[in-house]
Amino acid sequence: MTELVNITELLLSRIRDVRDYPEPGVVFKDITPLLADPAAFTALTGALAELTVRHGATKIVGLEARGFILGAPAAVQAGVGFIPVRKAGKLPGATLSQSYDLEYGSAEIEVHAEDLVAGDRVMVVDDVLATGGTAEASLQLIRRAGAEVAGVSVLMELGFLGGRARLEPALAGAPLEALLQI
């Protein structure tokens, strides 16, 4: 318990609030100070790796873009493969895609078709769970590829945006782990 409290305090101390960014009234949670601190970054990726191992994942999917920064080193520490999930049109070759709705419009994410297969247990890693749209689409994409969802792990969950409630049906019993609740 003390170790978790210490990690929580360390992570929180390295996240900067930027008021009125990207627009007035928004408080942006800037993780770049955390990434610049080797002790904090190592603690974060170590915690994500531990969750990956605990839930029996064989691969980590990192969501563009900060999910790449967190997911790749966590995958190395956990001894599992890393798969980037990109915005549509960014991956060469054969891909699987999944569209999802945004507040005003829609978006699409992709993964290389051969990167996820039956028998894979996949942990989704990202920096923030906000509304849950991208995470929900990634879970659909993982299952369409024939793989199993081991869970979703994020640095922080912005609870007031309702992402957890949106994800619950798509998780189908898989865990959602947030290191920080904001």
From Swiss-Prot:
GO terms for molecular function: adenine binding; adenine phosphoribosyltransferase activity; AMP binding. Its EC number is 2.4.2.7. Pathway: Purine metabolism; AMP biosynthesis via salvage pathway; AMP from adenine: step 1/1. InterPro entries: Ade_phspho_trans, PRibTrfase_dom, PRTase-like, UPRTase/APRTase. It catalyses: AMP + diphosphate = 5-phospho-alpha-D-ribose 1-diphosphate + adenine. It holds the Pfam family Pribosyltran. GO terms for cellular component: cytoplasm. Signal peptide: none annotated. It is found in: Cytoplasm. GO terms for biological process: adenine salvage; AMP salvage; purine ribonucleoside salvage. Catalyzes a salvage reaction resulting in the formation of AMP, that is energically less costly than de novo synthesis. Belongs to the purine/pyrimidine phosphoribosyltransferase family. Homodimer. This is Adenine phosphoribosyltransferase. It comes from Streptomyces avermitilis (strain ATCC 31267 / DSM 46492 / JCM 5070 / NBRC 14893 / NCIMB 12804 / NRRL 8165 / MA-4680).
